[in-house]
UniProtKB/Swiss-Prot annotation:
Signal sequence interval, chain numbering: 1-23
Reactions it catalyzes: N-terminal L-glutaminyl-[peptide] = N-terminal 5-oxo-L-prolyl-[peptide] + NH4(+)
Disulfide bonds: C143-C169
Protein name stated in the entry: Glutaminyl-peptide cyclotransferase
Gene name per UniProt: QPCT
Length: 368
């Protein structure tokens, strides 16, 4: 995550975010004293999760394996991978290979484009993995897979961005792998509402600034993809709706992997979904499923509010997409340093948050 902590801009950005939150239709609209019948693009605002019981939670968490994730997915991503680098290509191929090998039958696409940077034109490639492209509505879980570009160091070290965002990438791949059976069932369902709701995983390229964070030097992948989705009819052949309107909720993971993270609420219009994360965390703790965990160091805290942070959700937020931003506050101490590496990751924390996220996704998709 490359967004600098620019306090001078925080208040102005908060006003923008607040205005957008208020503009989002959280309740059915009334005209002339009667309630208009909401179309499918409005269903996200009344969507309800299927709360998993203890038996289901135990089954879900038994399917995930942090050690396997560490070896099979995290290690291949913990390399220098700034846009256009050999490492970027290698990580992109790894992500696609892992998703294409699952039984659920993901549609895995590369969104490749060129954009001007402080170093001239560069090629970027987002990865979009869609469980059921024919579904009208999609829960989106996203992160960025690029690492920040640093000039060659005298000691030969390279920036691998372990929390930023190798770990979120690995967590998303582990989510797809461990929930493969349930997601296969969801894709095969032909009856509403399951047939109309699916999952999309997005791995953004070019989140980081090459030189200094600015509107033109940052968020290359998300800016391009949001614009593309806004101009792409959805469902296919539609005349009045597009892929942006097909996003139910945009869950963005960033800077995850350090010990004792604290996630505050950034957007009030999605606070009810943040509350589900908090409740799931408590349920897992009550069931003894969180490792090296103390309730005094709770991860998700709905009583904490923070100004929004600039990240890959911004181009989608500006187009009215509901955002759930999972980025800790404060940032990890190793942020944007060569110390953001495997040595400074905390495996129990990653395992715990991964379990919480997997339960959340199943609940949202009504796969309880």
């Amino acid at each position: 995550m490359a967004g600098e902590r620019r306090d001078s801009k925080a208040a102005a950005f908060f006003c923008l975010a607040w205005a957008l939150c208020l503009a989002l239709p959280g309740f059915p609209q009334h005209v002339g004293g009667r309630e208009d019948r909401a179309d499918w693009t409005q269903e996200k605002y009344s969507h309800r999760p299927t709360i998993l019981n203890a038996t289901s939670i135990l089954q879900v968490t038994s399917q995930t394996n942090v050690n396997r994730m560490w070896q099979n997915d995290l290690h291949p991503i913990l390399i220098e991978r700034y846009p256009g680098s050999p490492g970027s290509y290698a990580v992109r191929q790894h992500i696609k290979h892992r998703l294409q090998g699952l039984q659920a039958g993901w549609l895995v696409e590369e969104d490749t484009f060129q954009s001007h940077t402080p170093y001239g034109y560069r090629t970027f490639s987002n990865i979009i993995s869609t469980l059921n492209p024919l579904a009208k509505r999609h829960l989106v879980v996203a992160c960025h897979y690029d690492s920040k570009y640093f000039l060659p160091q005298l000691d030969g070290k390279v920036f691998v961005g372990a929390t930023d965002s190798a770990v979120p990438c690995a967590m998303m791949l582990e989510l797809a792998r461990s929930l493969d059976r349930q997601l296969s069932f969801l894709k095969q369902s032909s009856l509403p509402p399951k047939a109309d709701l699916s999952l999309k995983l997005i791995f953004f390229d070019g989140e980081e600034a090459f030189v200094r964070w600015s509107p033109s030097d940052s968020l290359y992948g998300s800016r391009s993809l949001a614009q593309k989705m806004a101009s792409t009819p959805h469902p296919p052949g539609a005349r009045n709706t597009n892929q942006i309107q097909g996003i139910d909720l945009f869950v963005l993971l960033d800077l995850i992997g350090a010990r004792n993270p604290v996630f505050p609420v950034y957007f009030l219009n999605t606070a009810r979904w943040f509350g589900r994360l908090e409740a799931i965390e408590q349920s897992l703790h009550d069931l003894g499923l969180l490792n090296n965990y103390s309730s005094e160091r709770q991860y998700f805290r709905s009583n904490l509010r923070r100004y929004p942070v600039e990240d890959d959700h911004i181009p989608f937020l500006r187009r009215g997409v509901p955002i759930l931003h999972l980025i800790p506050s404060p940032f990890p101490r190793v942020w944007h340093t060569m110390e953001d590496n495997e040595e400074n990751l905390d495996k129990p924390t990653i395992d715990n948050i991964s379990k919480i996220l997997q339960v959340f996704v199943l609940e949202y998709l009504n796969l309880g």
